[in-house]
Regions:
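Alpha/beta-hydrolase fold catalytic core
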Residues: 1-18, 39-41, 77, 81-82
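Short hydrophobic segments within beta-strands
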Residues: 19-23, 87
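Serine-hydrolase catalytic-loop signature spanning alpha/beta hydrolases and amidase-signature enzymes
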Residues: 22-32, 43
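Gly/Ser/Thr-rich beta-alpha loop segments that engage phosphate groups in nucleotides
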Residues: 24-27, 52-54, 90
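A short acidic, amphipathic alpha-helical/loop segment
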Residues: 32-33, 98
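Active-site loop/oxyanion-hole signature of alpha/beta-hydrolase fold enzymes
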Residues: 35, 44-87
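Aromatic pocket-lining residues of Rossmann-like dinucleotide-binding sites
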Residues: 37, 99-100
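Gly/Ala-rich beta-loop-alpha elbow adjacent to hydrolase catalytic centers
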Residues: 88-92, 96
């Protein structure tokens, strides 16, 4: 399972906003955005496999867009996030597009 952080807004009715970083980055790149968006959304920040606190050797599969996309979906399912807005940069935006497909 990927490492991730959740910041839940006190208002349970607000939407989720999920942040996906690019290759070579990790969830800490979003620190400035967290300050603003946590006022209006529940936030989910994910470290992709092999990045940040998500250790790559914990995953048996080859690193493909499909496998990494499935990693993200597993986190969404674990947190019971049925709908989310997404913010991504570089590789993160490619993965978001794969999720949308």
């Amino acid at each position: 399972m990927l490492h991730y952080l959740c910041f839940k807004n006190p208002n349970k009715d607000v939407s989720w906003l999920t942040f996906i970083h690019g290759a070579g980055g990790n969830s800490s790149i979003w620190s400035q955005q967290i300050r603003f968006f946590k006022q209006f959304y529940h936030l989910l920040l994910i470290d992709l496999r092999g990045h940040g606190k998500s250790i790559s050797h914990e995953f048996d599969e080859v690193y493909t867009f499909e496998n990494v996309t499935e990693d993200i979906i597993q986190v969404l399912d674990k947190e019971v996030i049925k709908k989310s807005h997404f913010v991504g940069i570089s590789l993160g935006s490619i993965l978001i597009r794969k999720i949308a497909d």
